[in-house]
Amino acid sequence: MNSLYAKSKYFDEGVNLDNKEKFKEAQFKFEQEIVFNPKSELSYLYLSKIFNKLDKKDLEEQNLNTVMLLNPKNEEAIYNLAKLKLASSDYKKSKVLNNRLSSICNKFCNKNSELKIEIENLSKK
């Protein structure tokens, strides 16, 4: 088996396990994918979502930051990190991320507008 086949196999298995809500097993598959392909942006994104579901905020943030290092224009990672910062009452960082998202948004423009209102409302409290 060549490594190209193994890479996509691990990623696909991770997605299937994630869809079945087998998060620990999915996490392992995405980590295997990263061993073969350290720049697997989507694997890090899936890991961030898994850590969100497992309420491991530090690991979620770590993986979102990695996604953004690999692809500074990944709208989903920027949005999710802005939401994470908002949940921890870091309004300033959330606003900075949301402004960044608004400058590049393509798929997340509606969510960007909703998040802007949410940040403004929560930061007034």
Predicted regions and their residues:
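Register position in tetratricopeptide repeats
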Residues: N19-K20, K53-L54, A87-S88, I104, ...
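Canonical tetratricopeptide repeat
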Residues: Y46, N80, E114-E118
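Canonical positions in the second alpha-helix
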Residues: Q32-E33, T66-V67, R100-L101
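Terminal, low-structured helical/coil segments at or just beyond the last alpha-helical repeat
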Residues: K95-K125
